[in-house]
Design a protein with these regions (language model features):
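A conserved acidic beta->alpha catalytic loop
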Residues: 25, 40-51, 95
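Conserved donor NDP-sugar-binding/catalytic core segment of glycosyltransferases
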Residues: 100-131
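A short, conserved alpha-helix in the catalytic core of glycosyltransferases
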Residues: 156-158, 162-167, 174-202
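Glycine-rich, basic loop-to-helix element that forms the pyrophosphate-binding segment
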Residues: 67-83
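Short aromatic/hydrophobic "clamp" motif used to bind/position activated sugar donors
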Residues: 88
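Short, acidic, metal-binding catalytic loop of nucleotide-sugar glycosyltransferases
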Residues: 24-33
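Non-catalytic, C-terminal membrane-associated alpha-helical segments of glycosyltransferases
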Residues: 221-226, 239-297
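A recurrent flexible, glycine/aromatic-enriched loop bordering the glycosyltransferase active site
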Residues: 73, 123-124, 141-161
Length: 297
């Protein structure tokens, strides 16, 4: 499969130079994708970044979608709709792509049509080394391909038509959209499709501390339910009331951490965040999923 059949979609929020570096690296690949679509939720870039992005958009190197109201699944859905290629490759906005990233995704789809391809994510703490093949939990950083049941949202590709047939990503996953990938993977597998981990499709994730989902803060040091709501919504949506035991276990685990042992004053604040997240998840569950083309059903 030609790499020109691949549309790269990059949801981005609050990122400046690292976003420009990411796009520049993709444009410089010897076998680049057919297009790069930026689903940009940033309210305002600095003047220099704005000038570069506008130049790319005007010159046709990049399609620059300006979106309001930050939402990871909504940005991904808008990128999915805008993509022209039959294969859509979603990437984080703070990465360094391997030279054969797009080629590896294209080859995987040629070898296994119709599957979702989960790429390898080399994180800063890996220090350039792969994980052992038997590492638990699986961290998408081994050297052997395998069938998997989930994927990481910063490096995966799938057939556009198949994703649209499922309604895209559930926009009920708010704020940091925690577990939105797991919920989509659940629906993908339930529909009879498969997920394949492909280690040759490699990115170096820079994990820049500013911007992106980290704008909403860290889950250990906030009383906001930005992480908890996604965890509870995922459990209840995929398991219904059978998900209640796992929800109760999460409530206990949320305060059974070294952070809370050393800073016990965070325990009541964390419990407030968790309970708020659980109630919010119940409300979202009652309202029904928000898929592409269906609104709130």
């Amino acid at each position: 499969m030609d790499t020109r059949a691949v549309s790269v979609v990059i949801p981005t929020y609050g990122r400046g130079q690292v976003l420009l570096d990411t796009v520049e690296a993709l444009l410089s690949l010897s076998n680049p994708p057919g297009e790069i679509v930026l689903a940009d939720q940033t309210v305002r870039h600095d003047e220099a970044a704005e000038r570069v992005l506008r130049g790319w958009d005007d010159g046709g190197q990049v399609r620059w979608l300006r979106l309001s109201d930050p939402s990871i699944p909504r940005a991904m859905n808008q990128g999915l709709l805008a993509a022209a290629g039959p294969i859509v490759l979603f990437l984080d906005d703070d990465i360094r792509p391997d030279a054969e990233l797009v080629e590896a995704h294209a080859r995987a789809h040629l070898a296994r049509p119709g599957e979702l391809v989960a790429g390898r994510m080399l994180q800063p703490w890996h220090e350039g080394r792969a994980d052992p093949e038997d590492k638990v939990p699986f961290g998408f950083n081994t050297l052997a391909p395998r069938s998997v049941t989930e994927f990481m949202g910063g490096n995966f590709s799938l057939p556009r038509d198949a994703a649209l047939a499922l309604g895209g990503f559930d926009e009920n996953f708010v704020r940091v959209a925690y577990r939105f990938e797991a919920e989509f993977a659940f629906r993908w597998l339930q529909s009879g499709r498969r997920i394949r981990y492909e280690p040759g499709a490699l990115i170096h994730h820079l994990k820049v501390p500013a911007g992106g989902t980290r704008t909403f803060g860290e889950h250990l040091t906030t009383m906001r339910p930005n992480h908890a709501v996604g965890a509870y919504y995922y459990a209840l949506k995929t398991q219904r009331w059978r998900g209640l035991p796992s929800a109760v276990r999460r409530l206990g685990r949320a305060v059974a951490t070294r952070h809370h042992l050393r800073r016990p004053w965070w325990i009541p604040l964390t419990l407030i965040a968790e309970l708020h997240g659980f109630l919010w998840a119940l409300m979202l569950l009652g309202r029904g999923p928000r898929y592409l083309g269906r609104g709130e059903d």
